Amino acid sequence: DESLDNIVRSYIKEKYKKPGDVFLGVVHRLDRPVSGCVVYARTSKALSRLSELFRTRDVKKTYWAIVTDRPPSEEGVLSNWLKKNEQQNKSYVYDKEVKGSKLAELSYLVLARSEKYYLLEVDLRTGRHHQIRAQLAAAKCPIKGDLKYGAPRSNEGGGISLHSRKVTFMHPVKNEEISVVAPLPEDRIWKLFSNV
């Protein structure tokens, strides 16, 4: 299973006819079972500038999630404390601060529903380990296929129904808004919501 980094590095080498090793700066990552937008930098200067935008939260990340149960309301804000368990590679949700926890906030909106599922648009206000997965599970609407966080069944292929739909930021030099939108995965569950 070739890594996304290697695929992008090969693409840059071919597209820009780069001899030798190609610089590729990883600006941020997605959890392995998550699909969608990932931002890379082709130069060290771009990496520094883009990393600063992500560090200062001057980037808007919008996710789409298919959940198995009705969310608490049609739209809302989830605010909890998350604590990461390194051994289990899992985050636990608390209603109040506990030692080692960090505040986690996201907003969500129900975009559509099918007979069995709900499509949510999720905007992160903070960026914590497994934040969307843990908070939606704690709200009793786990992401489809996410066994780690309480989904009843896995998805075909092992992924989860969480998709980094859009990443928006200001170009660090041109001061123009950049929006990167990822097409939805080509599987039957996402096709239920292809008209959204």
Explain the meaning of each model-derived region:
Residues 1-196:
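RNA pseudouridine synthases
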